[in-house]
Amino acid sequence: MADVSIPVSEPFNAKKGSPYNNGGLAPRAYDDAPQKGHRVHHCLNFIVRLLTAMASAAALTTMVKSNQGPARWRDFWAFKWFIIANAIVLTYSTLAALASLLGEWTRRGPLSSTPLAWLTFLVDFLLANALMSAASTATAISWVGRKGQPNAGWEAQCVAVGGFCRRVLGALIASYIGWVLLALSTILAATAIHRLRRRSAVAN
């Protein structure tokens, strides 16, 4: 008995690049997404990355310029770690923002494939934890300098170096804002992974 092949007609509104017009190949996981939804996702990711870079830059700059008399950030390992962590987040967020902007135009950004989305998620997660670690240790030192520790005989120092303490406080606030934005980037990456896995399951 001869094989009978049943032709499948493509919809009348099938566009170029759609699952019905890709040369008979299986639909790709992310390229099948509506262009508008794809661009909105990458645009939101770009905005969050840019704001994260700005917050980290503000925290880094404020801490570096916080010196007042004998009070210097170089004398505290917690503040050194704070600057290193924010510098790493600033560099990463800037590069990630550029990648997101490129992905919005080319549809080949960091959230366009499952491996890249997983890598983005893991890096965001690790850097968010590192930034929280740096901010929390710097907050502890700042709190002791502002309030002192009577049981240990440590007196508050911010009365003598108020400008230093105010600038450190500003840097801490900016860093915590950067952490919130970085956590939001992690959520966006997790959302992209979910969407990619769902489309891959539908395609299979």
From Swiss-Prot:
Keywords: Cell membrane, Membrane, Transmembrane, Transmembrane helix. It is found in: Cell membrane. Residues 65-81, 136-167 are extracellular. GO terms for cellular component: plasma membrane. It is a multi-pass membrane protein. Residues 1-43, 103-114, 189-204 are cytoplasmic. InterPro entries: CASP/CASPL, CASP_dom. The chain crosses the membrane at residues 44-64, 82-102, 115-135, 168-188. Homodimer and heterodimers. Belongs to the Casparian strip membrane proteins (CASP) family. This is CASP-like protein 1U4.
